[in-house]
Amino acid sequence: MATNPLSNLDKYEVLLASNSPRRRQLLADLGVTFRSVALSDIDESYPSDTPALDVAIVVARKKAEAYSSLISSNQLIITADTVVVCDGIVLGKPADIDDACRMLRMLSGKTHHVVTGVTVSTASRTEAFKAVTEVDFAQLSDDEIRFYTHNYRPLDKAGAYGIQEWIGCAGISGIRGSFYNVMGLPLHRLYTVLSSF
């Protein structure tokens, strides 16, 4: 039987600080045994002068700081934050269906960036990085936008869409960078960092 390439993590209880079902699935797909945890009162604000492409890493670091005093020496915690940046505007999760439609109209026919900030921390060490993926959206009709927003779950996703859902199949004409980053965790980069612990 072959050894898991991430067996170096066996000395830790790995914690994923996220409620995202996509992040949980992606980390499991990477072969990591972990437990999900989530604090409900983490301040995810950021200074107004933060460059749009740095917002996700700033928020991921704030999440790591919120957990830093709570982890023990045998624990490793992963935090992440994903945003969509279009025309210099940061798009988080939509407030409601109307907001989701507004976001998708903004993305329609344009190239945007999906940025995920990630931290991996133990009691004595923190590694932080961000991944950026360029995503090209085809021109979407109002009917396509309404179909997606009323039949799928855009409200729990940055930029109001999931690349793995119908809109990704029908509306995304190209990507440059990590596909998994668009889903919420840049797995290759995360694997490389986890291998170093």
Q: How would you label these PLM feature ranges?
A:
Residues 2-15, 51-197:
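Anionic-ligand binding patches
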Residues 34-47, 126-132:
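Short glycine-rich, Thr/Ser-proximal phosphate-binding strand/loop in the N-terminal lobe
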Residues 21, 41, 187:
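Short, glycine/serine-rich, charged loops/turns that create anion-binding
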Residues 32-33, 43, 110, 151:
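A short linear boundary/processing microfeature
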Residues 13-38, 196-197:
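N-terminal G-site helix/loop of the GST-like fold
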